[in-house]
Regions:
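Short loop/turn motifs that connect adjacent beta-strands in outer-membrane beta-barrel proteins
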Residues: 23-36, 133-140, 187-192, 222-223
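Transmembrane beta-strand segments that form the barrel wall of outer-membrane beta-barrel proteins
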Residues: 192-208, 232-234
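Residues that define the transmembrane beta-barrel architecture of outer-membrane proteins
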Residues: 34-36, 74-78, 120-124, 138, ...
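Residues on the lipid-exposed face of transmembrane beta-strands in outer-membrane beta-barrel proteins
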Residues: 40-42, 80-86, 126-130, 144-146, ...
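Cleavable N-terminal export/targeting peptides
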Residues: 1-35
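Short glycine/proline- and aromatic-enriched beta-strand/turn motifs that initiate or cap beta-hairpins
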Residues: 22-94
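Extracellular/periplasm-exposed beta-strand and loop segments of Gram-negative cell-envelope proteins
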Residues: 48-75, 95-123, 149-174, 203-204, ...
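Predominantly the C-terminal beta-signal and adjacent terminal strand-loop region
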Residues: 209-259
Length: 259
């Protein structure tokens, strides 16, 4: 919690130079109408990754990677939120995909052998939405949908100065239902607002719990909005007595383009 508060304090300060009064023609809070409306939001998520593996009550392994460590191994990444509404009904999708490539390294005690590991992870959230509450200062959607998580890993072994080698790949996928809330609250009469998101789900395909939260601060413009905040995703799965957890958290920044 202290980390989130500290992050948001710094982020809020970075927006302090923007105009405090509301500008004409700017829609800070979305309004329900009988026409189609929507937004496309590409964003950057500087996430850390933590996790653990346990058998029954015995912890077998744990990992903790900082954002700078992850960035140095990224081959490709895409992060995008899409949403569309007609009246109070709507739909949304949140897409996170990353391909990481570990540096080649010699295998201990085997100087003629080297390995290269590639990991692809996709986190896809799809939901139907319904606007529960809407005023000039507050917007609140309820949502229900699914979260799909895919992980594909591949390790290649190579014998130095030869064509010989071996490879092994593994793929895992899980789908779990989720439900939650999302929206924004306007700050006074300005174009500043607080965006928020929370969902929780699980109890399907071995997924015990999956939950995601985001809170931040944003500024609305005629074309859309700029937001910065803190995002966290937690997932716990259990199968055949083996429990795995994964936690992704970090600063998120995006530009939302309205249409």
């Amino acid at each position: 919690m202290k980390k989130i508060i500290s992050t948001l304090t710094i982020l809020a300060g970075s927006l302090a130079a923007l105009p405090a009064q509301a500008a004409e023609g700017v829609q800070t809070i979305p309004q329900v109408t009988n026409e189609w409306r929507g937004a496309v939001t590409p964003y950057i998520w500087a996430t850390t990754i933590g996790g653990s593996v346990a058998y029954e009550e015995t912890k077998l392994a744990s990992v903790d990677y900082r954002a700078r460590d992850i960035i140095s191994h990224i081959n490709f990444a895409a992060m995008l939120t899409l949403e569309a509404h007609h009246g109070r009904l709507g739909a949304m999708a949140d897409i996170v995909f990353a391909k990481l490539n570990a540096q080649k390294s010699e295998i201990l005690g085997k100087p003629n052998l080297s390995s290269n590991t590639t990991v692809e992870q996709g986190i896809y959230t799809f939901a139907a939405t319904y606007t529960i509450y809407n005023t000039k200062n507050t917007y609140l959607d309820g949502l229900a949908g699914v979260r799909v998580m895919n992980v594909v890993s591949r390790t290649d072994l190579k014998v130095a100065d030869s064509v010989y080698g071996a490879s092994n790949s593994n793929a895992k996928s899980s789908t779990a239902p989720i439900a939650g809330l999302k929206g924004r609250v306007r700050l006074g009469d300005s174009n500043y607002f607080i965006p928020f998101y929370i969902d929780v789900g699980g109890m399907a395909q071995g997924t015990q719990v999956t939950t995601q939260q985001m809170i931040g601060i944003g500024h609305a413009y005629e074309w859309g909005a700029a937001t910065i905040g803190f995002k966290n995703l937690y997932n716990r799965q259990k199968s055949s007595g083996i429990t795995t957890t994964q936690s992704l958290s970090g600063v998120v920044a995006g530009l939302s383009i309205r249409f």
